[in-house]
């Protein structure tokens, strides 16, 4: 980015939407790490704490019902935002890291065996590399890397040479957090499916910059964080195809993710709640919903 582009951006009409920028002369250039928050997101969180603060999904009194409505309405908004088939395909997590670990632990450890291969790109953030290293060590699977050219491109020839009948999971970023360049994610997903593999997409860097349609993309799993989308820290999303999520065991155990519990056994809640153990980050979810409204309001163009 050239300096005159930065200066032009600093005078943008949208700058006034962000208190930290509006009240200072800061020119913020670290949005790949975390975005600033617009006033609309701050106001939504403030309103939740002032008027609806209670533990969602845990009570039938007015405040808890309102908090539950806010929480589930946000889930519906996220599902619509990425064009998921239904809100049950949206799992709230702490961040993209937890979303990817959920897939690795709950799907990977239960579906990968010795001799299988897991393919990841050399461009991966640690969040989409270390979980698959763990799965490979635990199962005896082989971790295979899709290497890139000097300019960062992952070629179709490289993809074709590394994804084969032994490949069971392909995990790849949509946009590199280091280079900022897109991967040929559509072709990678198509190739993964052609050999019967599951495709896991790290969308943390892509979703702030382009409209995501998980149906058109045909990703089996798609992970992202709220804090890079003008939302608060501490809230992430995992999208997963319903048939895959239904077959996966819970990642964590605790309150609200069970239907019945006795001394010796328990039955788990239906999707999406079987993956959301413990007290949820309700204010983070509300802030994420407000961030989606803000981003859709200004548009991706």
Spans of features found by a protein language model:
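Pyridoxal 5′-phosphate
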Residues: 2-301
């Amino acid at each position: 980015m050239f300096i005159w582009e930065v200066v032009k951006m600093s005078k943008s009409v949208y700058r006034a939407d962000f208190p930290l920028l509006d009240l200072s002369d800061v020119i913020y250039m670290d949005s790949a790490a975390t975005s600033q928050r617009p006033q609309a997101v701050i106001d939504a969180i403030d309103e939740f704490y002032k008027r609806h603060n209670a533990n969602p999904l845990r009570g039938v009194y007015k405040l808890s019902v309102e908090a539950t409505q806010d929480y589930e309405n946000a889930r519906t908004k996220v599902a619509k935002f990425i064009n998921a088939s239904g809100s049950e395909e949206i799992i709230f997590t702490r961040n993209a890291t937890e979303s990817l670990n959920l897939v690795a632990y709950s799907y990977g450890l239960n579906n990968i065996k010795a001799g299988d291969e897991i393919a990841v790109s050399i461009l991966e953030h640690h969040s989409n590399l270390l979980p698959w290293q763990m799965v490979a060590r635990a199962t005896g699977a082989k971790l295979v890397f899709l290497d890139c050219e000097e300019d960062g491109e992952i070629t179709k020839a490289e993809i074709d040479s590394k994804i084969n009948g032994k490949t069971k999971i392909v995990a790849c970023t949509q946009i590199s957090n280091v280079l900022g360049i897109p991967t040929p994610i559509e072709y990678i997903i198509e190739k993964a499916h052609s050999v019967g593999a599951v495709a896991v997409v790290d969308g943390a860097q892509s979703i702030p910059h382009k409209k995501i349609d998980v149906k058109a993309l045909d990703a089996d799993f798609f992970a992202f964080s709220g804090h890079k989308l003008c939302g608060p820290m501490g809230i992430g999303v995992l999208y997963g195809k319903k048939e895959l999520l239904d077959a996966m065991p819970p990642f964590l155990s605790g309150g609200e993710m069970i239907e019945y519990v006795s001394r010796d056994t328990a039955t788990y809640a239906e999707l999406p709640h079987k993956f959301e153990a413990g007290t949820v980050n309700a204010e983070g979810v509300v802030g994420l919903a407000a961030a989606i409204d803000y981003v859709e309001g200004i548009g991706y163009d």
